[in-house]
């Protein structure tokens, strides 16, 4: 139990695992999984560990997915990319722009690997992965059988996909297929992007604006450990939103296609005067209340305690109950984050 997980999670929480294996191809990943399973150990597959909170020591094998490679197919209507799951997401965004293939610029600086992007259906500034995802290639761990899921089969939702449900433990993502249409359409619906002129804006300007917003608001995990947005933006019924807006007319709200309304969790937390609040070694970030940061050798108990406090305060004031976006990992695998902080 002496393999530290601290370098493998951006929160910088210091727990150990029994074994840590880096897999650079599909066969190495399968071998590591099958070896650990034969020994009766639980197995966790990680990308860059940018969306996990280890609650305790992990009693099994952690496999770090480092399957690399980018292939491009140039078709008349779009560029098709086949990207290894272990590629860094932001480096991919930069690469596509440099190569004149826009479409990912709103998703700049999202931490983590390409293989993690469909699990969460990552999104930012009005764009989600499902907008550009063509397929996801997986391998069935027990058999080594390769499976390709179309974007529709991935059942993408808000920070959700089939990879959090039926496909969670039996399959590993080895590559993601992206489709970037040649008729580029800027998405300028959020934040500072609304100030850009849709008739003249370039993909590089959108990329630069997104990077500026993220770097000014969000802490660098290399300086202060964090897992990005700790809570999901809550999606509530139209009735709940109407009641809340009658009391708090300035609350940011984003009506969804299905009639529900997305609220800004950061705003709700901020209204409870929780920015900068600290418990043990963890604190609510002073610029972006949605982020919890490791100020000083935080322990996982500190994070759970502070997350519970934030959830209670927001729930009491707004009757809206926040759910973590971060995945909570116990001794033998993922546990319910909501139950842990309730």
Curated annotation (Swiss-Prot):
Its cofactor is FAD. Its main location: cytoplasm. Residues 13-183 form the FAD-binding PCMH-type domain. SUPFAM superfamilies: FAD-binding/transporter-associated domain-like, Uridine diphospho-N-Acetylenolpyruvylglucosamine reductase, MurB, C-terminal domain. Substrate binds at residue 190. GO terms for cellular component: cytosol. It comes from the Bacteria. Monomer. Cell wall formation. Belongs to the MurB family. NCBIfam families: murB, PRK00046.1, PRK13903.1. This is UDP-N-acetylenolpyruvoylglucosamine reductase. The lineage of its organism: Bacteria, Pseudomonadati, Pseudomonadota, Gammaproteobacteria, Enterobacterales.
């Amino acid at each position: 139990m002496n393999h530290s997980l601290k370098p493998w999670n951006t929160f910088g929480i210091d727990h150990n695992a029994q074994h840590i294996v880096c897999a650079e191809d599909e066969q190495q990943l399968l071998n590591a999984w099958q070896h650990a399973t034969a020994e009766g150990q639980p197995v966790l597959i990680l990308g860059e560990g940018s969306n996990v909170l280890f609650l305790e020591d992990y009693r099994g094998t952690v496999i770090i997915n480092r399957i690399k490679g980018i292939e491009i197919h140039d078709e008349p209507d779009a560029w098709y990319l086949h990207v290894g799951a272990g590629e860094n997401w932001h480096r991919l965004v930069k690469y596509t722009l440099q190569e004149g293939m826009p479409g990912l610029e709103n998703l700049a600086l999202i931490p983590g690997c390409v293989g993690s992007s469909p699990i969460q259906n990552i999104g930012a500034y009005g764009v989600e992965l499902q907008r550009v995802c063509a397929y996801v290639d997986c391998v069935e761990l027990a058999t080594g059988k390769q499976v390709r899921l179309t974007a529709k089969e991935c059942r993408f939702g808000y920070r959700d996909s089939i990879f959090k449900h039926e496909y969670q433990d039996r399959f590993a993502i080895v590559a993601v297929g992206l489709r970037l249409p040649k008729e580029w359409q800027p998405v300028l619906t959020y934040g500072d992007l609304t100030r850009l002129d849709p008739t003249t804006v370039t993909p590089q300007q959108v990329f630069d604006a997104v990077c500026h917003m993220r770097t000014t608001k969000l802490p660098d995990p290399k300086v202060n450990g964090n897992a990005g947005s700790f809570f999901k933006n809550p999606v509530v019924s139209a009735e709940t939103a109407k009641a809340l807006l009658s009391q708090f007319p300035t609350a940011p709200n984003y009506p969804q296609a299905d009639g529900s309304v997305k609220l800004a969790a950061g705003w709700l937390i901020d209204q409870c005067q929780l920015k900068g609040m600290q418990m043990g070694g963890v604190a609510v970030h002073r610029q972006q209340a949605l982020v919890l940061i490791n100020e000083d050798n935080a322990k996982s108990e500190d994070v759970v305690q502070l997350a519970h406090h934030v959830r209670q305060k927001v729930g009491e004031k707004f009757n809206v109950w926040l759910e973590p976006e971060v995945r909570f990992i116990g001794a033998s695998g993922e546990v319910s984050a909501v139950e842990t902080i309730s």
